[in-house]
Amino acid sequence: MKISSLFLGAIVLALPLSSAAAYAQEVCNRLTEAEVSAAVGVELHRSPTDPCRFGHAFKSFSIIIHPGDGYRFGDYAANARKEFKDTQEVPGIGSDAIFYATNLAVKAKGDVVVISMYLGKSPAERIALAKAVAQKLIAHM
């Protein structure tokens, strides 16, 4: 049986994507609902369909992990600064972090973590909540 090179190429390209998604799900699954609730000050439940999403609608947050992309954080931050005038540095989390719109992007342990925070009434409150979640998450990486 002969395997086409196109099929083999698709498998090779899909493997890193599936392993990146599996890594993100594994890290998010280590983050407990109790840790999340303590970090944000309200009880939140994990989505039954996405281990990286907690809460519902505008009382929620989600996590995206880009494994191994830490070296690209500078480019990521530069693009955010171009697109969002409210982009600001966030000290005290990871090796580098910025906040823009509703997102905290953190460079930690060679990865980039983005937390989209829909809790909090002001940018300062959203930053504090996202930072608290990020600290818990990074401890599980």
PLM regions with names:
Residues 8-18:
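Bacterial N-terminal signal peptides
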Residues 27-28:
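A structural boundary signal for the start of the first folded domain, especially the loop/turn
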Residues 86-141:
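A short, solvent-exposed beta-edge/loop patch
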Residues 1-5:
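Positively charged n-region of N-terminal signal peptides that target proteins for export
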Residues 9, 23, 82-85:
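Short, functionally important structural connectors and interaction interfaces within domains
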Residues 18-24:
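Sec/Tat signal peptide C-region and signal peptidase I cleavage site
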Residues 34, 38-101, 108-109:
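Short, solvent-exposed recognition patches
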Residues 31, 35, 39, 75, ...:
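Extracytoplasmic/secreted proteins, especially bacterial periplasmic and envelope-associated proteins
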